[in-house]
């Protein structure tokens, strides 16, 4: 097994096994959505209303609908999405502060 496959295969397998919806962005900018039905060294079968065979060399990014946690032993596990933490003031607060000056 190639060293580059050691992260890719468990990641794709977790997405497939958990039936996590994914968005796949191709290098030409096209966005495909569905669930990973199967994959091998060269292709990913993406299922939505139809099954599409997508060549990996045409893929730029795979974005799962929810987070995947990775264990050091190579296995992956799905997690519910985490809520974003707000670290700045809301825009309304900034606008209100500017008007008061």
UniProtKB/Swiss-Prot annotation:
Leader sequence residues: none
GO biological process: regulation of DNA-templated transcription; regulation of RNA stability; regulation of translation, ncRNA-mediated
Gene3D superfamilies, per database record: 2.30.30.100
Compositionally biased intervals (Low complexity): 77-91
GO cellular component: cytosol
Residue span of region Disordered: 68-91
Domain Sm: 9-68
InterPro entries from the UniProt entry: Hfq, LSM_dom_sf, Sm
Keywords: RNA-binding, Stress response
GO molecular function annotation: RNA binding
SUPFAM superfamilies: Sm-like ribonucleoproteins
Subunit structure: Homohexamer.
Family (UniProt): Belongs to the Hfq family.
Function description: RNA chaperone that binds small regulatory RNA (sRNAs) and mRNAs to facilitate mRNA translational regulation in response to envelope stress, environmental stress and changes in metabolite concentrations. Also binds with high specificity to tRNAs.
Protein name, UniProt field: RNA-binding protein Hfq
């Amino acid at each position: 097994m190639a060293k580059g496959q050691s992260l890719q295969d468990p990641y794709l397998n977790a997405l497939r096994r958990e039936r996590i919806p994914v968005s796949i962005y191709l290098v030409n900018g096209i966005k495909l959505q569905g669930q990973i039905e199967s994959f091998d060294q060269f292709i990913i079968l993406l299922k939505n209303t139809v099954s599409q065979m997508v060549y990996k060399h045409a893929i730029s990014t795979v974005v799962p609908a929810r987070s995947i946690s990775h264990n050091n032993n190579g296995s992956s596990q799905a997690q519910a999405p985490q809520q974003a933490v707000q670290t700045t003031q809301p825009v309304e607060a900034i606008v209100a502060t500017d008007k008061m000056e």
